[in-house]
Amino acid sequence: MYKRQYETSGNNPQYGKYFFSPGIDYHNPVAMLEQRDDEGIRKEFSGSVNASLRIIDGLKISAMGAIIERSERYGHYYGRYYPVNIGNNGTAETYNDHYKNKMLEATIDYSGTFGDHKLQAIAGYSFSEESSESYDQMNYKFDTDIFGFHNIGNGGALKEGLASMGSSKEDNRLIAFFGRVMYNYKEKYLFSASVRYEGSSRFGDNHKWGTFPAVSLGWRISVSYTHLR
């Protein structure tokens, strides 16, 4: 559905050039665009490096490192004649955010077959660190719309204690040592055991580290009774 463009009467220009009338539900979409200013920029970088080395047949060491970094900055301004802003004399908002994530993992794994026996094992270390910061501000009651959100401190709401602002910061770190062994006999009987020793800044003060073991047994019935077919 499209809305028509309305030109205001030259005898009553007080509500802005294109509005038919303020405070009602039919406003010119062109005017709404002119009464609103949105700007933003987002920068993001991500990169990773992988390396592996085969020491002997069946034995390999690997390492992986990665980083993700992102920054965002946004600004919005709603003019005094914008439909939802009438009476506020302009509203300005700004938002800034920065995020960073660093990861590292190193492993050594082995795989070998001895007759009817097959063995696989892996051990490793992993590290992950995240950090984020954000800031936001909002102010209104401006004397003019000329400066938009670039003059956010001059809104009258700040002087009256009605403006708002906020900020946040969070850092998280995760470190883990892990290992896993898998064994099967004739692809029929299966065994697996794993353990992970993990420390996290998100854990409680008295429990920064935890051990997480797991064991499983299996039997492939289809393999056991294949000869009966």
Language-model regions: role of each:
Residues K3-E44, M64-I175, V223-L228:
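Surface-exposed loop/interface segments of Gram-negative outer-membrane beta-barrel transport/assembly proteins
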Residues G47-L53, A106-Y110, A123, G179-Y183, ...:
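Residues on the lipid-exposed face of transmembrane beta-strands in outer-membrane beta-barrel proteins
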Residues L53-I55, I67, G112, F127, ...:
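Short beta-strand segments enriched in hydrophobic/aromatic residues
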Residues D57-I61, G115-A121, E187-Y189, T211:
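Outer-envelope beta-barrel architecture signal
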Residues L174, R180-M182, S194:
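Exposed, low-structure sequence patches enriched in small/polar residues
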Residues A176, G210-F212:
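Transmembrane beta-barrel architecture of outer membranes
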Residues F191-F203:
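Transmembrane beta-strand segments that form the barrel wall of outer-membrane beta-barrel proteins
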Residues D205-W209:
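Short glycine/threonine-rich loop-to-helix capping motif typified by GTGT followed
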